[in-house]
From Swiss-Prot:
One GO biological process term: L-tryptophan biosynthetic process
Organism: Pseudomonas putida (strain ATCC 700007 / DSM 6899 / JCM 31910 / BCRC 17059 / LMG 24140 / F1)
E.C. designation(s): 5.3.1.24
Name of the protein described by the UniProt record: N-(5'-phosphoribosyl)anthranilate isomerase
Reaction equations catalysed: N-(5-phospho-beta-D-ribosyl)anthranilate = 1-(2-carboxyphenylamino)-1-deoxy-D-ribulose 5-phosphate
InterPro entries: Aldolase_TIM, PRAI_dom, RibuloseP-bd_barrel, TrpF_fam
Gene3D superfamilies with a match to the protein in the record: Aldolase class I
Length: 206
């Protein structure tokens, strides 16, 4: 049985958040990036969070958001953790009185160890697929052999994961956590409860 943590990202509906919690997800993610098909506004996020059971971590995903925009969201949405998924510098990620993680889009030749050291204040590093011009949510996996055995920070593995490949991904990378969005959807932004259950079952059995 696996102790790998899990996050269901791109939640836009209360029923999907509850399905994730019921299936045993440790965290759910809200995308505050208007260009994403999974984007939510503060009203949606607040309504969903208000219905959550205890012990489900709420994560806000941001892509090159201004400090003003981010602070306005944090004033009204009770987020536990911030996920920076753009080109933010370490300084951009600090100062919000919330723990945070930094997403890196992986491609051959990247020095992931140096990147981890650069984002020293991050609680973890999320590794996602590199697609030019797309900050995330590509639905494509990357070459897991590019991930060093030890990076010095908890690794959250993302990018093209589903019930069919997450067991293999966990065996190969040995991440602290896995992050899924498109792999548990029936349409962009609309989750499928059966796919969430299958994904969580595969994580636990890995």
């Amino acid at each position: 049985m696996s102790n790998v943590r899990s996050k269901i990202c791109g939640i836009t509906r209360i029923e999907d958040a509850l399905a994730a919690a019921e299936a045993g997800a440790d965290a759910i993610g809200f995308v505050f990036y208007a260009k994403s098909p999974r984007a939510v506004d503060v009203r949606q996020a607040r309504a969903i969070i208000a219905e959550l059971p205890p012990f489900v971590t709420t994560v806000g995903l941001f892509v090159n958001a201004s400090r003003c925009e981010l602070n306005e969201i944090l004033e009204v949405v009770p987020l536990d953790l911030l996920q920076f998924h753009g080109d933010e510098t370490p300084q951009d990620c600090e100062g919000y009185h919330r723990p945070w993680i930094k997403a890196l889009r992986v491609r051959p030749g990247d020095d992931l160890e140096a990147a981890c050291q650069r984002y020293a204040g991050a609680r973890g590093i999320l590794l996602d697929t590199y697609v030019p011009g797309v900050p995330g949510g590509t639905g494509e996996a990357f070459d897991w052999s590019l991930v060093p055995a030890r990076l010095g920070k908890p690794i959250i593995l993302a990018g093209g994961l589903s019930a069919d490949n997450v067991g293999q991904a966990i065996a190969r990378v040995k991440p602290y956590a896995v992050d899924v969005s498109g792999g548990v959807e029936q349409a962009k932004g609309i989750k499928d409860a059966a796919k969430i259950e299958a994904f969580m079952r595969a994580v636990k059995q890995a």
